[in-house]
Amino acid sequence: MPVLHNRISNDELKAKMLAESEPRTTISFYKYFTIASPQQTRDALYQVFTALDVFGRVYLAYEGINAQISVPQSKVETFRQQLYTFDPALDGLRLNIALEDDGKSFWVLRMKVRDRIVADGIDDPSFDASNVGDYLKAADVNEMLDDPDAVFIDMRNHYEYEVGHFENALEIPADTFREQLPKAVEMLREHADKKIVMYCTGGIRCEKASAWMKHNGFNKVWHIEGGIIEYARRARAQGLPVRFIGKNFVFDERMGERISDEVIAHCHQCGAPCDSHTNCKNDGCHLLFIQCPQCASKFNGCCSEQCCEELALPEEEQRRRRAGRENGNKIFNKSRGRLNSKLSIPDPAE
């Protein structure tokens, strides 16, 4: 029988990836389309991806597919062709190629079936997810940014917005996409007569959000084709000014792609200009936060003196303290209190 799940330890896989000599290309893509049998599709696609040495994170649901992966450079075109011929709905699918890439974004292939490819919390049976807003290409985005009648809405989470966003874009303060959707409707009521432009990292969240806004009575709704990644790529290729400021947070080991030279965030410990996310080195914490090199040295990669002290304890004592603890895996959020329960590297489907 074919192998449909990874059977090698994470440590072994990571060491193997780091020892690879061939460069890898980090790619993200998504597609909203009907999948009649997500589990069957998942198993078939897993075999295709495994044969091409693809690593990464892939979600499938009845509503489509959402993927962030890395592919050996010599196999990118083969991957593209096999993906396009796997299902007619995937033929010609746009692949977002990473803007900054060291090829070390993933080291294992995880492919899961979920209820939704993005957790939206929508349970309204009358909602039509296909009734989306109009696409905007790079040149159109820059025109809209200069339009006083347009309002840009960032459909990413607070830790993403903190390190980079479009000029004057509104933040919808929330920890998850499902929390953002009702807040966006509420916050934008006063802008109902404006042109609403929504964006996210690669397009998947803002596409669904645009449909949700239209469902709630907003008529002038656009979203950026391919999200921040494709916008920056096209703007650079066409010699256009790149109007995104700062860094684009990404959901893999890189944790960010530099878009502009500006550093708009600050170290969460000392306040110095910094936009580098990290996870607290204390395995009982793993807080996602921004830390400058000086504080990383001072606190040994930890988020606090308490975690620094705990990290210095014997491993057995650290394990004892971690046992049954419920306050690990958190994200720093200045807008809603210091700690909020989450994954170390947040789940892009949330």
From Swiss-Prot:
One of its GO terms (molecular function) is oxidoreductase activity, acting on paired donors, with incorporation or reduction of molecular oxygen. Keywords: Oxidoreductase, tRNA processing. Residues 146-240 form the Rhodanese domain. The keyword Oxidoreductase applies. CDD domains: RHOD_YceA (cd01518). Pfam families: Rhodanese, Rhodanese_C, UPF0176_N. It comes from the Bacteria. Residues 319-350 are annotated as: Disordered. Disulfide bonds: none annotated. Residues 319-328 have a biased composition (Basic and acidic residues). The active site is at C200. Transmembrane segments: none annotated. The keyword Iron-sulfur does not apply. It catalyses: uridine(34) in tRNA + AH2 + O2 = 5-hydroxyuridine(34) in tRNA + A + H2O. GO terms for biological process: tRNA modification. It is an enzyme of class 1 (oxidoreductase). Its EC number is 1.14.-.-. Belongs to the TrhO family. Catalyzes oxygen-dependent 5-hydroxyuridine (ho5U) modification at position 34 in tRNAs. This is tRNA uridine(34) hydroxylase.
